[in-house]
Amino acid sequence: MIDEAVRAVRARTKVVPDVAIILGTGLGGLADEVAVETRIPYGEIPGFPLSTVESHAGELLVGTLAGRRVVAMRGRFHVYEGYTPQHIGLPVRVLQRLGARTLLVSNACGGMHPLWNRGDLMLIADHINLLGSNPLVGPNDDRLGPRFPDMSEAYDSGLRALARGVALERGITLREGVYVAVTGPNLETRAEYRMLRTMGADVVGMSTVPEVITAVHMGMKVLGVSIITDQCLPDALAPTSVEQIIAVARGAEPALAALVGGVLERLN
């Protein structure tokens, strides 16, 4: 299926991307920064799942951003939509086969750190997988990666240092911490937020981890950035909605675009 998907994309474009980008909830507008050479709906790529979530357009963009050849997923997939981690990881395998060696992932998340605010960006230093499964479960294809990939540096330290430098130079507030992935689609209870915080997580979301595990399995370097869209403090918890989450994510897009653009400009 990977080969079929790669052939379908290559039939539409000859661009060989350096960098792959996955845009999460409310962040599709960042795709407007891409000088698009080719636009391919997911439904026209064999094996690609289809996005069913509001604000996930469901198309692959090939073009340039900040002087780099990029392939960008405008919309991603989630376990709560009924997809397995293997389904979610397949597009990453396609992006890597198209030529991308670096993966930039973004997401909207709930913030559990008491000193962080809505709209802040957080550099993902590490993650906790509470999805209950893993994209590498099942027979391993040694052509794609090792049976037991090391995850001690899932989020590349060099890319994180680069992002910190860009944020400092451009005056962008950039936190750094641990992302925990849960299945959703419901938001968490007060007790669950307390548990996740005790485990060492700073933010919580419903995506990203399957794609990152898949990318690391294939030898890609990964940079992850979360936008904190709601504050998940158990003792001061207020109801929120998807509409509010999307609005905060979109409000933070200029900062995310500036950060991503700066990182791309400085990549070796």
PLM regions: where:
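Structural motif
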Residues: P17-I21, R68-A72, R101-L104, D120-M122, ...
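His/Asp/Glu-rich mid-to-C-terminal helical/loop segments that flank catalytic regions of hydrolases
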Residues: C232-N268
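A C-terminal functional module that forms or caps the active site or interfaces directly
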Residues: L187-C232
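Active-site/ligand-binding-proximal alpha/beta "capping" segment
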Residues: R160, G165-D202, L267
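Polyanion-binding loop/helix "lid" in catalytic or ligand-binding cores
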Residues: L144-Y155, A167, A181, Y193, ...
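Glycine- and other small-residue-rich loops at beta-strand/loop junctions that grip anionic moieties
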Residues: Y80, F148, S152, A181-P185, ...
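Metabolite-binding pocket within alpha/beta catalytic cores that recognizes anionic/polar moieties
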Residues: M1-M151
